[in-house]
Amino acid sequence: MLSYFIPTAKGLAPLLEVELKEMGIENPQQMNGGVKFEGTLEQGYKVCLWSRFASRVLLKLSEFKVLDSMDLYLGCSNIPWETHFDVDKTFSIDFSGTNDEIRNTQFGALKIKDAIVDRFRKHFDERPNVQKRDADIRFNGRLWKDKATIYLDLSGSPLHLRGYRTIAGEAPLRETLAAGIIKRSGWQGEALLDPMCGSGTLVIEAAMMALNIAPGSLRETFGFEKWKKHDQECWQTLKTSAQVYGRRAVNQCETRFYGSDLSKDMIEIARKNAQRAGVGEVIEFSVTDAKKVLPPEELETGMLITNPPYGERLGSFSDTITLYTELGYHFKDAFAGWNLSMFAMDTELLSCLGMRAGKSFKFFNGPIECVLKNYRISPKRPAVEVEPVAPKKTNKETPEPINPWTMGQNESVVEAAIENESELVFKEVQQIKPAIYAEEFANRLLKNLKQLEKWAKREGVECYRLYDADLPEYNVAIDRYAEYIIIQEYRAPKEIETQKVRRRFLDVVSTVRYVLNLPDDKLVIKVRERQKGRQQYEKLDTKKQSLVVHEGQAKMLVNLQDYLDTGLFLDHRPTRLLIGNMAKGKDFLNLFCYTATASVHAALGGAKSTTSVDMSKTYLAWGEDNFAENGIKGKHEFIQQDCIKWLQHAHEMYDLIFIDPPTFSNSKRMNDVFDVQEDHVALLTSASQRLNKQGEIIFSNNKRGFKLDVDAIKALGFYIKDISQSSIPEDFRRNKKIHQCWILTKHTD
């Protein structure tokens, strides 16, 4: 009998052991890094041909004790290498393991190479050549403590290289790992769909299983073909049997397979891979966004299985969280009654799906530890009229979920729920407490909600800040926009470990969803630097989904997805309302107007005219849309220009001017760099020249530590009134340095 060691990726050894038993191999045993067994040459060939989980097939040639490099050399010198390959063939050595004397794998491989070369020279006066890539024959040395084992690699190139994938996408799954994922998913032959299929590996491997295609039958070469003891007749018999008798006819396959991806190029690659694998006729590929893919109409159930991109592939961890959260929403809505198997970088990411998993399995995708979790997506229940259940007082330490989104529908019940921190249960929304739950953060969130909801209801405030890095460990801002919640992650300092930052952010997402009992599609996640003023108008996406929110008598269009900012600066809510009260009968100028929300309030407050100036064409158009949303007509002008440059050439006079400049700006459209601390006097000087007698300027900025040059401003003929404290709304009281604000009134003399 021959001795074999079959290495495999971490997490696949149990599957490999079962697979070997199914091949008729007796007593396979798991060991570190793989499975070993005693068997025939035919069985070694069979593993090369049929194993879906093996990385290589290693035939043991010798095993001996090694205390130092000389022991390794002498032990290898005693192996009859000439009985395994001829001197005119090339060879290569793979070596793994170290001990106290052999501390480098390259050194270990070099000693084996020296022993082989010296033995050939001794017997034939010639030596074979080493070829690291595509060698005729490959050997493997493994050192464990004081024992070395030398193997012949029957597989040659790794067995995950099936032969059908000539082009792969970014960070592709190895075929062996894909097969393991499918096996662990619990798939029983039902329809299978991968909504992010990339180059198609998962769906192709599943189809090959269904058609009983031997994974090794597509390979052109194996490592044993130049081996002197190779039994060609035995190998050809096995290969013919696999090709002729083992494969089921395509027309007999009842299972249907579907693969979709957002990339047209990847789908084209996947189609070609499937054709090469012989499964192209049973797989239907399409170019579709995973968040929009739908099950085939005729299928009421099936298997969703996928490997979504990791944060490194997406570009940011926040993007990954957003993707997983949106996938959870969509899968629960569109694939009710299906099974779902998700392969991901970590358990915390999968918590963003908002589903409770059944079984989970640990794998490694190369060096990255990953997890596979299996879910049953509950079938949709018939729609029923829902009545809230009255809350019951609770003494539990852990706060139960409440539902603030029903405010106004059943106010007494909601108020009681907030007051008692008890559960507001809706039959259609049943939140299960997540595995990841930050209790301290949850308590602070509930405390803020309790304080702010009554205020918001009393003041008619629809959009407000619920949390703003109140606890240093949870460095996020959480805003409510009507029925939506936005979680904005502040970028952590470099000295904080990335893994710790990721874990805390996932704590936040999971806890917010549970505590607020959020409906499935009402959570938006963003990442941003801590703002320095209002300069960070970076575009994030192109969804162009607008939401109408109310502020006083005004209606505002906000965009929760496409930009870091939404179009409405919440901290300046009192300032905008103040402008509405001050603007009646006045000509109003709004510099650095952003989306012209202050101009909307001025117009609705009875301003004679409004002029809104900003460099951004996008935000000015947004401002015009805000005016249209409110049905505002009359003398209202929108000017796209550098505000500082425009002031230098303007001739119109105004009664009320609002100036809320960025902290810093070096836009390409500006001739000079703007710094609010250094340049505010010059800015206010220019603005004062456009001000009528008894006119007023409301000046504000967000620069931390900003110092108004009082003497210079007074010299311009202004009375100065600091309204910073009164201009900070209730929801920003926890951060009283969010902005500073002054009313500058021109002397009458």
From Swiss-Prot:
Segments for region (Disordered): 386-406
Transport recorded as keyword: no
GO cellular component: cytoplasm
Xref: PROSITE patterns: THUMP, UPF0020
Domain THUMP per the UniProt entry, residue ranges: 43-154
UniProt keywords, alphabetically: Cytoplasm, Methyltransferase, RNA-binding, rRNA processing, S-adenosyl-L-methionine, Transferase
Similarity field: Belongs to the methyltransferase superfamily. RlmKL family.
Matches recorded under HAMAP family: 23SrRNA_methyltr_KL
Protein name: Ribosomal RNA large subunit methyltransferase K/L
Organism from which the protein derives: Psychromonas ingrahamii (strain DSM 17664 / CCUG 51855 / 37)
